[in-house]
Amino acid sequence: MQVTPIAMEDASFAYRLGTECTEDVVARLATLGASSYLVVADTTVAGLYGHDLTARIDKEAGPAHLLTHESGEVHKDLTTVSVLAEQALERGADRRSVVVALGGGVTGNITGLMASLLFRGIRLVHVPTTVVAMLDSVLSLKQAVNATFGKNLVGTFYQPVEVLADTAFLRTLPPREIRSGLGEVVKNALAIRPAMLDRLGDALRADARYDDETLRWIIAESLTAKADVTRDDKHERRTGLVLEYGHTAGHAIEHASRGEVAHGAGVAVGMTIAAEVSRRLGHAGPDFVALHRELVAAAGVEPAVPAHVDPALVKNWLAYDNKRGYLDSPPGHTPMVLLSAPGEVLHTGPMPLVPVPLALLEEAVDEAARRGRDAAPAAAYVGPPAAGPLP
């Protein structure tokens, strides 16, 4: 497996990437010398990979137990964390146990939060099985679950001891999840690494068919992008906030859909809304908005709020964005990450955020919703989150 050191201030861990490397994954886990291995997966991933991986860990590394949770964003909450923690303790978890998060971003966040709480923190290893997880969520120390009032509002910062990624897991992903992952890649290119835009534009496939070489390049570029902005900001409260590009409207769309809109697809649409906001504020021109829509469409996501999502609900969730409090924003404003051009982030003082009038943001959401009503449904965000073979 190719090893990339990940360093964020005083936090560091190895990211190991390969293809068809399950033996290497098990061998790396064995080196940790755990008293037990607690593999956490949703019910879908458990059927595809969880039982087999747990059996191999049990045979080659040490006692292993598979803990499962229901699939989907609607189950990413404290109740699920509590149930899994009780199951872990029932199976004899102790301070020398290792928790293995096997799955996508939902499982990674649930498991990461559980690992941070058990015995006030036991070792965590991510084994991501989705594009979003491989190139985005496992590279963050943020471990959070949803609350009634919005996404990712309850959580901690907690680092894994390793990330073990095998692109072979991606072969069973439905196109919806592949497209979702590419939404985050487009974000990285637009906000952090504009040098990758030309190659990415050529590589994007609306049918979501990518070979292993392209996927490894996409993941490697995303590792570099994230490292560029988190090296001196492990908690993503300063330069790392750039990673929130597209997330203000994106999270609102995702939450309003009750998980039917995949995370990366929500972020992709959220970026097109952010670009339109930037245009309306006079920071960017129409060509910049067009570039966003072209890239998002090339990734297979309709660049509009989907017709089945109520724009009134989207606008309601905007007020609960998790970036509130970073700026002393005037009443009726919310802080957003905005760009004036690819790689050109707007700042308020040292912070990569701009206070945006909620009324203006809501107008941009309404405009995107009108375009969505005129568009054909896009597979990237239509359908329940557990419709495909992976979450």
Curated annotation (Swiss-Prot):
One Pfam family named in its UniProt record: DHQ_synthase
Highest taxon of source: Bacteria
Task: Tell me the keywords, alphabetical order.
Answer: Antibiotic biosynthesis, Cobalt, Lyase, Metal-binding, NAD
Under Enzyme Commission nomenclature, its number is: 4.2.3.124
Tell me the Gene3D superfamilies matching this sequence: 3.40.50.1970, Dehydroquinate synthase-like - alpha domain
Q: Does the record bear Nucleotide-binding in its keywords?
A: no
The UniProt entry, under SUPFAM superfamilies, shows: Dehydroquinate synthase-like
Q: Which residues form the active site?
A: K142, E244
Where, by residue number, does NAD(+) bind? 42, 73-76, 105-109, 129-130, 140-142, 151-152
Substrates-to-products reaction catalysed: D-glucose 6-phosphate = 2-deoxy-L-scyllo-inosose + phosphate
Per the record, the pathway is: Metabolic intermediate biosynthesis; 2-deoxystreptamine biosynthesis; 2-deoxystreptamine from D-glucose 6-phosphate: step 1/4; Antibiotic biosynthesis; ribostamycin biosynthesis
Keyword NAD found = yes
Q: How is the cofactor bound?
A: Binds 1 Co(2+) ion per subunit.
The entry's Co(2+)-binding residues are E184, H247, H263
Per the record, the GO terms for biological process are: antibiotic biosynthetic process; aromatic amino acid family biosynthetic process
Q: Name one GO molecular function term.
A: 3-dehydroquinate synthase activity
Required cofactor names: NAD(+); Co(2+)
* Protein family: Belongs to the sugar phosphate cyclases superfamily. DOI synthase family.
Described function:
Catalyzes the intramolecular carbocycle formation from D-glucose-6-phosphate to 2-deoxy-scyllo-inosose (DOI).
The name of this protein is 2-deoxy-scyllo-inosose synthase
